[in-house]
Amino acid sequence: MTSKTNMTSNKFAYDFFPWSNDTNSSQQIKNIKPPPKRSNRPTKRTTFTSEQVTLLELEFAKNEYICKDRRGELAQTIELTECQVKTWFQNRRTKKRRCTSPLRKSMMKKSDERSPSPQNPSSQHVQNLQTFFHSWPSHFAYSLPSDQQNNV
């Protein structure tokens, strides 16, 4: 009785999966080799020259996302692979987000409060701009109209 059920189940398998009984396909499966194992060594880190970084930064300043065509041109110009340029842009966007995050700003504010400095550099910059703009008309051959002339 058991042999009859085995035959029925085999016929079922053969009807739905005819390749399962094919010796040629099972031989092909045995010949498939797994992909080669990666070595335990880490991949070599790319060291960019100052010229490469300058050109990459200039391109990033124009556009944070580089299209495929421009990436190819830039990669060829600075003698890098497209993958290296793409990765540099990804890392640079991450760096920008990290540097402009609210958490980082709050940490910077706390560190500014801790370190005694005679004057905050940003406030010094604002004062320099104010001084420049107060004396601005004297830098030019013509003078700007005064408030009295506008009221006449």
Swiss-Prot record:
Pfam families linked: Homeodomain (PF00046)
InterPro entries noted in UniProt: HD, HD_metazoa, Homeobox_CS, Homeobox_TF, Homeodomain-like_sf
One GO term describing the cellular component: nucleus
Subcellular location: Nucleus
Gene Ontology molecular functions: DNA-binding transcription factor activity, RNA polymerase II-specific; RNA polymerase II transcription regulatory region sequence-specific DNA binding
Record field: compositional bias (Polar residues): 21-30, 116-126
Segments of skewed composition (Basic residues): 35-44
Positions of region (Disordered): 21-48, 92-126
DNA-binding region per UniProt: 41-100
Swiss-Prot/TrEMBL keywords: DNA-binding, Homeobox, Nucleus
Coarse class of the protein's main subcellular location: nucleus
SUPFAM superfamilies: Homeodomain-like
SMART domains: HOX (SM00389)
PANTHER family named in the record: HOMEO BOX HB9 LIKE A-RELATED (PTHR24333), HOMEOBOX PROTEIN CEH-62 (PTHR24333:SF8)
Complex formation: May interact with homeobox protein ceh-14.
Biological function: Probable transcription factor, modulating expression of helix-loop-helix protein mbr-1, perhaps acting in concert with homeobox protein ceh-14. May play a minor role in axon guidance in the DVC interneuron.
Name of the molecule in the record: Homeobox protein ceh-63
Natural source organism: Caenorhabditis elegans
Encoding gene, per UniProt annotation: ceh-63
